[in-house]
Curated annotation (Swiss-Prot):
Record-linked Pfam families: Ribosomal_S19 (PF00203)
NCBIfam families: rpsS_bact (TIGR01050)
One annotated GO biological process: ribosomal small subunit assembly
PROSITE patterns: RIBOSOMAL_S19 (PS00323)
Protein name: Small ribosomal subunit protein uS19
Gene3D superfamilies in the record: 30s Ribosomal Protein S19, Chain A
Keywords linked to the UniProt accession: Ribonucleoprotein, Ribosomal protein, RNA-binding, rRNA-binding
Cysteine disulfide links: none
Length: 92
């Protein structure tokens, strides 16, 4: 379900402050965030965020194509190892 247009995009308040501090300092450092639910805004383009996936922070470099998506989309929480191989088929 899509968020109402009149509400605008959701971004945690502390996130805007962190992004402004890094941009003002001029250093290209990873901004650690836990807010996977926040929307990526145009002012985040060019910055690198460490998005928490429940285990560690995954570095996500924000590009133009990511604007409007959520941070959680770019840091998977589950590791897929594939389906188990068929042992009977290998013996033949």
């Amino acid at each position: 379900m899509v968020r109402s247009v009149w509400k605008g995009p959701f971004v945690d308040g502390y996130l805007l402050g962190k992004a402004e501090k890094v941009r003002a300092s001029g250093r290209n450092e990873v901004i650690k965030i836990w807010s996977r639910r926040s929307t990526i805004l145009p002012q985040f383009v060019g910055l690198t965020f460490g998005v928490y996936n429940g285990n560690k922070h995954i570095p996500v470099s924000v590009s133009e194509e990511m604007v409007g998506h959520k941070f959680g989309e770019f840091a998977p929480t589950r590791t897929y190892y594939g389906h188990g191989a068929d042992k009977k088929a290998k013996r033949k």
